[in-house]
A protein has these predicted regions:
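Extracytoplasmic segments of membrane-associated envelope/inner-membrane machinery
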Residues: 61-136
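Soluble extracytoplasmic domains of inner/organellar membrane proteins
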Residues: 113-168
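Extracytoplasmic/luminal low-complexity segments enriched in Pro/Gly and acidic/polar residues
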Residues: 154-200
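Periplasmic polypeptide-binding modules associated with outer-membrane biogenesis and secretion
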Residues: 1-11, 28-79, 83, 119-123
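Envelope-exposed proteins and targeting segments
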Residues: 1, 13, 33, 37, ...
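Solvent-exposed, non-transmembrane alpha-helical starts
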Residues: 28-30, 71-74, 110-116, 159-161, ...
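Solvent-exposed coil/turn segments that connect beta secondary-structure elements
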Residues: 8-10, 55-57, 65-69, 76-78, ...
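Periplasmic/extracytosolic POTRA-like scaffold domains at the N-termini of outer-membrane
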Residues: 6-45, 98, 102-116, 179
Length: 200
């Protein structure tokens, strides 16, 4: 049968998806369970949604949504590991650009991924708009409720706290940093309690 893939990107390769769909489809596409295919494909790091459709007589079309890495985990000088918002390691497709992807410095990739503070940081980072992600120069995740992003080399420092109430926190940050009357000559915005933001 024919299997086609729509929506792969430089972090989730078409061949990865084809491999899994092919294993699931086995000999007969007619007998394949869309549900099983979707479930398996969603397990690929970076895939946020998967839809499998049979096209008779013997084709299968898999449509995926693939996200960019939530962050790059940096260990040592040159070692970068891409991870998605769920803390799953992405296999970079060669030539993938890491530009605009926030970097978190960690001692060890495996350990950090089981760490609550890194998990919270990934949730926050993956939810931020591209424009903000592009200008993040440093991410600190000392504890799970003190996630901080530094923008443009410290021109703005945003303390998010944890990933709760993110929508509200993002709205508050947006309002503060884009209003010269509010931010003035200050640099630090703490929205860990979004209803009582602290600007210093």
């Amino acid at each position: 049968g024919n299997i086609s893939v729509v929506g792969a990107n430089e972090w989730v390769s078409e061949s990865q998806v084809l491999d899994i769909a092919g294993q699931q489809a086995g000999k007969s596409i007619l007998l394949v369970s869309n549900n099983d295919v979707e479930k398996k494909i969603k397990e690929i790091p970076g895939v946020t949604s998967a839809q499998s459709k049979k096209k008779l007589p013997d084709s299968l079309e898999v449509t995926i949504k693939a996200q960019k890495p939530a962050a790059m985990l940096k260990t040592g000088e040159d070692s970068m590991t891409a991870v998605d918002s769920k803390g799953r390691i992405l296999n970079s497709v060669s030539g993938a650009s890491v530009e605009g992807i926030p970097v978190i410095e960690v001692k060890d990739v495996e350990t950090s991924l089981s760490n609550r503070s890194i998990k919270e940081a990934l949730k926050i980072l993956s939810s931020l708009p591209e424009s903000m992600r592009n200008s993040i120069t440093k991410v600190t995740a000392e504890t799970q409720d003190s996630i901080t992003t530094e923008i443009n080399g410290g021109d703005r420092v945003i303390v998010w706290g944890d990933s709760s109430g993110l929508k509200l926190k993002k709205a508050v940050v947006d309002k503060i940093i884009n209003d010269p009357n509010v931010i003035g000559d200050k640099h630090n915005v703490d929205v860990s309690a979004p209803l009582r933001p602290i600007i210093k």
